[in-house]
């Protein structure tokens, strides 16, 4: 990958000049000038996904200049480097190959001169066999009863992705009840297991090192809870499996290493749902649906690696995001799925984006002079319309939004879906085109109001519009289409990191807090006041000690 400061490129300087002509351009004028703008600024992927980016503050010239930035910063070379197994995560000396996990074409991918695909396929076979046994009832608990409930214990990438996917694909779930525990707050594990039967519960402990503090704390509490009923530690092996590479620690915990599912250091946590970390997905939906999820992602991988940049959906979305964040100063993006099953999608890509591109030094270790990752947030529609859309429509901060919806609902109750989608379509129209003072006054006049009655309230009913959105319309949310959608966002994030000259696949920012927590934990064991920190931290710890009894 090229280490290029994007702000020093000719393309960046050209974009700055172009921005001066675009900063006040109205989306409404762009549509007036080109009534068929939709056909020029939208694309369909595999007849499953329509991506409409026409309601953005861009022209054909904007895209040409943004694409020049991608070319100058070596995006094509960066894509090739990732897919070929090059160690592009240089701070950890690792390849980045979540794409290998869903490489349904089974083409060789080499890391250190070794094809990784035989190992990937072997783990998939092992996962399938395990799923078939548990789902089919062949796997029995220590009393001889079949498994009814599965608890995935993990945190970060070992939790967010599997939880998001099993929720998004809930219509495909089988008879197994899936639960997720992540927080080290004891409430999470306590509330999850309090109504479960130890004899019919299977725990999946997801930790590559088998040392993650939150995960192992919860795993030991789950083990203690299980043994209160089961008694014999030999029974642990019938009720616990591991998603890990630390065979020694897994065995010491009491798990049969035959039920340890490995993954590799070239799998980043927030890109790991495609690996053994996705075992809970496969157990919940069936392995055939897990394979369809992989196939959808692989199809998007193929699009990303083989499509020219000017037609490449992840690249186009990435460039539009950089345009807003770095030239307009729009620092956040909202992800707004109009599908209740997708209620964890924004949270998943909050981690996916912010942990990947929330960096302030470039690949050469220098502080950057430009914006890197945006703040990502969002909630499902229409709930969000009744909470934060007020700010999106009329606030002083412009928030570019991604609206996501399926054309076909899994729950076609009366006219629910038509009402949901009418809101989906209306919101992007309202954000783009707004409502003028003149239109407000005409409405009041038609309602029989006098000019005096209108005068004081009209300013509050004006919508400036010109608020940018992307609309992503799926035919239906299926394992295949969801896989493609997730990969679309993954590759958008990668493209932005490549252009912004940062390391997208490390996360050193999570380390300092963990180090300090490990230092503070022993200080909490005693009741005596401490004075080893700043006055604020000392004060908080000492008040906690005085209040905890």
Curated annotation (Swiss-Prot):
The gene is pgi. Its main location: cytoplasm. GO terms for molecular function: carbohydrate derivative binding; glucose-6-phosphate isomerase activity; monosaccharide binding. Pathway: Carbohydrate biosynthesis; gluconeogenesis; Carbohydrate degradation; glycolysis; D-glyceraldehyde 3-phosphate and glycerone phosphate from D-glucose: step 2/4. GO terms for biological process: gluconeogenesis; glucose 6-phosphate metabolic process; glycolytic process. It catalyses: alpha-D-glucose 6-phosphate = beta-D-fructose 6-phosphate. Belongs to the GPI family. PANTHER family: GLUCOSE-6-PHOSPHATE ISOMERASE (PTHR11469:SF1). It is found in: Cytoplasm. InterPro entries: G6P_Isomerase, G6P_Isomerase_C, Phosphoglucose_isomerase_CS, SIS_dom_sf, SIS_PGI_1, SIS_PGI_2. Keywords: Cytoplasm, Gluconeogenesis, Glycolysis, Isomerase. Catalyzes the reversible isomerization of glucose-6-phosphate to fructose-6-phosphate. GO terms for cellular component: cytosol. Its EC number is 5.3.1.9. It comes from the Bacteria. PROSITE patterns: P_GLUCOSE_ISOMERASE_1, P_GLUCOSE_ISOMERASE_2, P_GLUCOSE_ISOMERASE_3. The active site is at residues 355, 386, 514. It is an enzyme of class 5 (isomerase). This is Glucose-6-phosphate isomerase.
């Amino acid at each position: 990958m090229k280490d290029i400061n994007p702000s020093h490129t000719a393309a960046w300087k050209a974009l700055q000049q172009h921005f001066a002509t675009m900063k006040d351009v109205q989306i409404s004028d762009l549509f007036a000038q080109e009534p068929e703008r939709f056909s020029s600024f939208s694309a369909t992927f595999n007849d499953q996904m329509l991506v409409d980016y026409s309601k953005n503050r861009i022209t054909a010239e904007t895209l040409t200049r943004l694409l020049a930035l991608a070319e100058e910063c070596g995006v094509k070379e960066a894509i090739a480097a990732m897919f070929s197994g090059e160690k592009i995560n240089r701070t950890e000396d690792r390849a980045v190959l979540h794409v290998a996990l869903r490489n349904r074409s089974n083409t060789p991918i080499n890391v250190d001169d070794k094809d990784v695909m035989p190992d990937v396929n072997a783990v998939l076979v092992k996962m399938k066999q395990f799923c078939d046994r548990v789902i089919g009832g062949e796997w029995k608990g220590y009393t001889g009863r079949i498994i009814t409930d599965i608890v995935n214990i993990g945190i970060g990438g070992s939790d967010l992705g599997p939880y998001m996917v099993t929720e998004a694909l809930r219509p495909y779930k089988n008879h197994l009840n899936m639960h997720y525990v992540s927080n080290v707050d004891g409430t999470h594990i306590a509330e999850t297991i309090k109504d479960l039967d130890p004899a019919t519960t299977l725990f999946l402990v997801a930790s590559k090192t088998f040392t993650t503090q939150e995960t192992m704390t919860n795993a030991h509490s789950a083990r203690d809870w299980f043994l209160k009923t089961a008694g014999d530690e030999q029974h642990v092996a019938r009720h616990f499996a591991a998603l890990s590479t630390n065979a020694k620690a897994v065995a010491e915990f009491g798990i049969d290493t035959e039920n340890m599912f490995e993954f590799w250091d070239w799998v980043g946590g927030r890109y790991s749902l495609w690996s053994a970390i996705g075992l809970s997905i496969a157990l919940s939906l069936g392995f055939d649906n897990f394979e369809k999820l992989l196939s959808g992602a692989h199809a998007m991988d193929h699009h990303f690696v083989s499509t020219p940049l000017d037609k490449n959906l992840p690249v186009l979305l990435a460039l539009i995001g950089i345009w807003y964040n770095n030239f307009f100063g729009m620092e956040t993006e909202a992800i707004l799925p109009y599908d209740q099953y997708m209620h964890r999608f924004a949270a998943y890509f909050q981690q996916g984006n912010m942990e990947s591109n929330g960096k302030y030094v470039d690949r050469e270790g220098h502080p950057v002079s430009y914006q890197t990752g945006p703040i990502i947030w969002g909630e499902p529609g229409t709930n969000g319309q009744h909470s934060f859309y007020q700010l999106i429509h009329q606030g002083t901060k412009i928030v570019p939004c991604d609206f996501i919806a399926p054309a076909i609902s899994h729950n076609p109750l009366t006219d629910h879906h038509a009402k949901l989608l009418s809101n989906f379509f209306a919101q992007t129209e309202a954000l783009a085109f707004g409502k003028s003072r003149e239109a407000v006054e005409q409405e009041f006049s038609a309602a029989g109001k006098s000019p005096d009655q209108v005068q004081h309230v009209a300013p509050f009913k004006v919508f400036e519009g010109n608020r940018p959105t992307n609309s992503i319309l799926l035919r239906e949310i299926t394992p295949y289409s969801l896989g493609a959608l997730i990969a679309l966002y993954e590759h958008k994030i990668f493209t932005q990191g490549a252009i912004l000259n940062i390391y997208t696949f490390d996360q050193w920012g999570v380390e300092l807090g963990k180090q300090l927590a490990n230092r503070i934990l022993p200080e909490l064991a005693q009741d005596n006041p401490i004075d080893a920190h700043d006055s604020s931290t000392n004060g908080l710890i000492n008040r906690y000690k005085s209040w905890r009894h």
